[in-house]
Amino acid sequence: MAGVRLVFTKAFMVTVLLTLLLNIGVKPAEGQFSACSFSSRPHPRGICGSDLADLRAFICSRRNQPAMVKRDAETGWLLPETMVKRNAQTDLDDPLRNIKLSSESALTYLTKRQRTTNLVCECCYNVCTVDVFYEYCY
């Protein structure tokens, strides 16, 4: 038996590697992103269903609210010293005011994260943080 030599073809090796990848799965490094598939199940500490929608709405509504400002106790109106006044002269002196771009050119400056996952994948099938919810606020 010392003289037995195993010979594997490329097709056999590719089949073995694909089988291993499909059965074991490729997991991302911790903290990079969450991977989900059709066989994913909710994490024991994940937030799912209407709880997920409610929490997203709450976090996004709190994020978009302005900072606390002083209000008149009797009327509830903002006090004048907390209001921001625009200065017409500084608005005219703005160096970016005369820059004109086509819509197509202007859109190239906007960056948006390419999503490979969604909120359910990140927060129901995995455990997520508040920062993940912020990424889904519009």
Swiss-Prot record:
Disulfide bonds: 48-124, 60-137, 123-128
GO molecular function, one term: hormone activity
Matching SMART domains: IlGF (SM00078)
Pyrrolidone carboxylic acid: residues bearing it: 32, 114
One Pfam family it belongs to: Insulin
Broad class of the protein's primary localization: cytoplasm
Tissue specificity of this protein: Expressed in the cerebral light-green cells which are giant neuroendocrines cells involved in the control of growth.
Compartments reported by the entry: Cytoplasmic vesicle, Secretory vesicle
Signal peptide feature range: 1-31
Alphabetic keyword roster: Cleavage on pair of basic residues, Cytoplasmic vesicle, Disulfide bond, Pyrrolidone carboxylic acid, Signal
Gene Ontology CC entries for this record: extracellular region; transport vesicle
InterPro entries in UniProt: Insulin-like (IPR016179), Insulin-like_sf (IPR036438), Insulin-rel_pep (IPR016724), Insulin_CS (IPR022353)
Propeptide segments, given as residue ranges: 72-84, 87-111
Family designation: Belongs to the insulin family.
Quaternary state and interactors: Heterodimer of a B chain and an A chain linked by two disulfide bonds.
Name of the molecule in the record: Molluscan insulin-related peptide 5
Source organism: Lymnaea stagnalis (Great pond snail)
Taxonomic placement: Eukaryota, Metazoa, Spiralia, Lophotrochozoa, Mollusca
